[in-house]
Amino acid sequence: MSNFTKSSSFNRRALSSLAIESPRNSSSSVFTSPIGSAFASPRSQNFGGSPRPSTNRLKEISYLFQVLIIAGTIVSFLVIIAGGYLYVVPSLGQTFLGYNGALEFNSSVVGDTECDIFDGNWVVDDNYPLYNASECPFVEKGFNCLGNGRGHDEYLKWRWKPKHCTVPRFEVRDVLKRLRGKRIVFVGDSMSRTQWESLICMLMTGLEDKRSVYEVNGNNITKRIRFLGVRFSSYNFTVEFYRSVFLVQPGRLRWHAPKRVKSTLKLDVLDVINHEWSSADFLIFNTGQWWVPGKLFETGCYFQVGNSLRLGMSIPAAYRVALETWASWIESTVDPNKTRVLFRTFEPSHWSDHRSCNVTKYPAPDTEGRDKSIFSEMIKEVVKNMTIPVSILDVTSMSAFRSDGHVGLWSDNPLVPDCSHWCLPGVPDIWNEILLFFLFRQPVQ
């Protein structure tokens, strides 16, 4: 049962009690109760004789008891209201308040059975895009589709609208305040790097002094660099990216291996740079795009578990072992009281059968099966069995409609079409709006 449901039930019980106890809700007031009758004013009772000398005394006693009864009723009323406030208001805060403190939601929050934030539709919204890629120094040239000559901007004007709840609109200054002193870490492949770039550009729109944002090592953004960290010095937080396309550790060539084996992937060993991740306040993982034959078997890379070379292991089976290794590391290393962990599901591409890339002008009316992914299902299964809470950013289905959002031929190399990566601004901005909702749906203390 959600907090909202429990709160509503409590309200009904409280109001039911008030209907009995409060003079406003009852035609028979406290003065007609047995206690009130016994100590009623002598004027209201016929004693069959003349008033006794103690009449004034009885009047005083009657008046005193009436006052006490009224006072008791009022106190009870206030206690009930106070209890209802303490119980209900925090729940309402979670249900109706977006991370910017505005009344944004008309239904349940993420995680409640009444609302799946990933079940919805794309709707046109002229408030988008959230930033200009040409004005953000952290967008790779290859992802700036408008800057690379894309002739229309309709693909920028779409917002994700869940069917039964609302994603809060991005309020940059509120988010900057909430991130003060934090460390946000993305770990994964180039899709993770794209989301990292998107978040930085979104956050920079709230700063007048853009020079206060810089890469901590003075590095330019490249595809192969293992670490990139951008510091927002005026708010004392960093947004970091660690390149770990498989999450597990690449292995060296074994001398006794068959000739076709050029390298291995150690499925039971997490990437050696994992010690850099564990102290983050927010950890966002992904892996999937490299788990294909072209990145593995066709390059001579095969799987290894312990000292055993698994030449016959399928890619899905290996992916599952790697996820279990990641999950064990999370459970043994990450402090859930400090670190919030999230895992983003597989991002669908929109290549045709002949590996041609036809980027559409508008979102596709149908997912054509791209809303399903064996990798995404494995992620959900593994996370479900973990002892530490992990949130899933289930972007697979919602992104499957966005055949209009890919880089296509509008990259830094127009000779190579790209229906895997996403334009910036674009779809990754929506992922980040949902990410921020997951992180900050609790009211600020």
Curated annotation (Swiss-Prot):
Keyword Metal-binding part of the UniProt annotation: no
An annotated Gene Ontology molecular function: O-acetyltransferase activity
Statement: the UniProt record of this protein carries the keyword Transmembrane: yes
Family per record: Belongs to the PC-esterase family. TBL subfamily.
Predominant localisation class: membrane
Motif (GDS motif): 188-190
Compartments it resides in: Membrane
PANTHER family attached to this UniProt entry: PROTEIN TRICHOME BEREFRINGENCE-LIKE 7, PROTEIN TRICHOME BIREFRINGENCE-LIKE 9-RELATED
Protein topology in the membrane: Single-pass type II membrane protein
GO CC, any one term: membrane
Short motif DCXHWCLPGXXDXWN motif, span: 418-432
Lineage, opening ranks: Eukaryota, Viridiplantae, Streptophyta, Embryophyta, Tracheophyta
Role played: May act as a bridging protein that binds pectin and other cell wall polysaccharides. Probably involved in maintaining esterification of pectins. May be involved in the specific O-acetylation of cell wall polymers.
Protein name according to UniProt: Protein trichome berefringence-like 7
Residues spanning the membrane: 69-89
Database matches in InterPro entries: TBL, TBL_C, TBL_N
Keywords, in A-Z order: Membrane, Signal-anchor, Transmembrane, Transmembrane helix
Other remarks in the entry: Contains 2 motifs that are conserved in esterases, but it is unlikely that this protein belongs to the catalytically active pectin esterases.
